[in-house]
From Swiss-Prot:
It catalyses: Hydrolyzes single-stranded DNA or mismatched double-stranded DNA and polynucleotides, releasing free uracil. It is an enzyme of class 3 (hydrolase). This is Uracil-DNA glycosylase. GO terms for cellular component: cytoplasm. Belongs to the uracil-DNA glycosylase (UDG) superfamily. UNG family. One of its GO terms (biological process) is base-excision repair, AP site formation via deaminated base removal. The keyword Cytoplasm applies. Its EC number is 3.2.2.27. Keywords: Cytoplasm, DNA damage, DNA repair, Hydrolase. It comes from Pseudomonas putida (strain W619). The gene is ung. Its main location: cytoplasm.
Length: 230
């Protein structure tokens, strides 16, 4: 996170977001992160993985957007895709509930791992609205500037991509609905898949079959939600 030319970003995203890297909030965010690293703090995900969501799902390929809040803050978990964990890491509770709903909705076997890279490569943008976090300190990088950047990402998708399904789970994700043109896209809302709330409507929401139905109606390939074994 130094200057625009040194940031590894998929070309479509880099072009669409170029102006953001000169905004005052981005300079402040860079300085905040520089100080965190200089203080010896452990920041997740590792630097090369911060923009994994954008690099794994090129702008022109976005079909679905799933919004998370901030990265997992345990060692070895976060790799830049919301809800996803690196191979070899136990599946987190919210993702377990996502798998349960996938099984109920589409009879997809529950995966033995939590690595969602294959979704990202099919056009599912797995975006945390805050893209970094300090180890063992949830929401430690909230309100430091990331939200301006990720709000712009949501707007860019709404403006430039046709027929996208936005899955907004929980109040935080639903607060972003104002950034989305509901006349062009499908917005599906539910409570968060966290064990604290999933039983209040996430389990039973049918979002995955509804997503694929929407895509197929528009002549687009559905998402294969079944994860390959590692």
């Amino acid at each position: 996170m130094t200057d625009d030319d040194r940031i590894k970003l998929e070309p479509g995203w880099k072009n669409a977001l170029r102006a953001e890297f000169d905004q005052p909030y981005m300079h402040q965010l860079r300085e905040f992160l520089r100080q965190e690293y200089a203080a010896g703090k452990e920041i997740y995900p590792p630097g090369p993985m911060i923009f994994n969501a954008l690099n794994s799902t090129p702008l022109e390929q976005v079909k679905v957007v799933i919004l998370g809040q901030d990265p997992y803050h345990g060692p070895g978990q976060a790799h830049g895709l919301c809800f996803s964990v690196q191979p070899g890491v136990p599946t987190p509770p919210s993702l377990v509930n996502i798998y349960k709903e996938l099984h109920r909705d589409l009879n997809i076997p529950i995966a033995s791992h939590g690595y969602l890279q294959s979704w990202a490569e099919q056009g599912v943008l797995l975006l945390n609205t805050t893209m970094t976090v300090e180890r063992a300190n949830a929401a430690s990088h909230a309100k430091k500037g990331w939200e301006f950047f990720t709000d712009r990402i949501i707007q860019v998708v709404s403006e430039q991509c046709p027929n996208v399904v936005f899955l907004l789970w929980g109040a935080h994700a639903q607060s972003k609905q104002k950034l989305i043109d509901g006349t062009k896209h499908l917005v599906l809302k539910s409570v968060h898949p966290s064990p604290l709330s999933a039983y209040r409507g996430f389990l039973g929401c049918g979002h995955f079959s509804r997503t694929n139905g929407f895509l197929e109606q528009r002549g687009l390939a559905p998402i294969n939600w079944a994860l390959p074994p590692l």
